[in-house]
Amino acid sequence: MTLSRYAPLLALVATSLFAADSNSSDEALVSRIAFGSCLGQDGMQPIWDQVQRAKPDLFVLLGDNVYADTKDPVELRAAYAKLGAQPGYQRLKKAMPVLATWDDHDYGENDAGAEHPNKEASKQVFLDFFGVPKDSPRRQRDGVYHAEVFGPPGKRVQIILLDTRFNRSPLVFQEDKTDLVDGGRYLPNDDPNATLLGASQWAWFEEQLRVPAQVRIIGSSIEVVDEDSGGEKWANFPLER
């Protein structure tokens, strides 16, 4: 997704949220969740103070958390450092838990997938920035997918964040199209071996869906419902969808 087409996004889920099991990260009641994406790290980010004024219990970043667009992990780390230096982000991080997945521009480059040559280094930079311990099992996964459970027993919410980059098969590009959207006119990939999440992530995802939960929120960095645009979407991998 491109920064020119998407302004910083803030969405709130404000309802009575109840969810899931004994693998709870925090037993404090969660009743309001904020979501964001598409953050240009080089400018002012007043959005963070707007988020805090809404008083969410939890904040979830859904990708393009910085626009690094680089295969160089040093440059990627520098882009994250600019985000980390934002005063509003620092205040928000102290006020509530922050969960995240990535999209293409914080993964490496526009519309990149499994072919990204430095994806493992990008993953470690991502995990470093979001404070994942060096001995965490997440460091060994094939991607940044992650799930957490919040809230007391009987009133728990599970957040599942998918990684639609690390294992994604090549996109199918229709060369003769001139009405380009998000950098290309992509077609469905009907190859039975093509994947969006990869086998390990699918197995993990199935396990997460078995976690007892009254409310389960699944985050994807690319569009789930869209059928018609030429950009990136789950419909590009119909067998996975």
Predicted regions and their residues:
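Positively charged n-region of N-terminal signal peptides that target proteins for export
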Residues: M1-R5
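Bacterial N-terminal signal peptides
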Residues: A7-S16
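Metal-dependent phosphoester/phosphodiester hydrolase catalytic core
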Residues: D21-R241
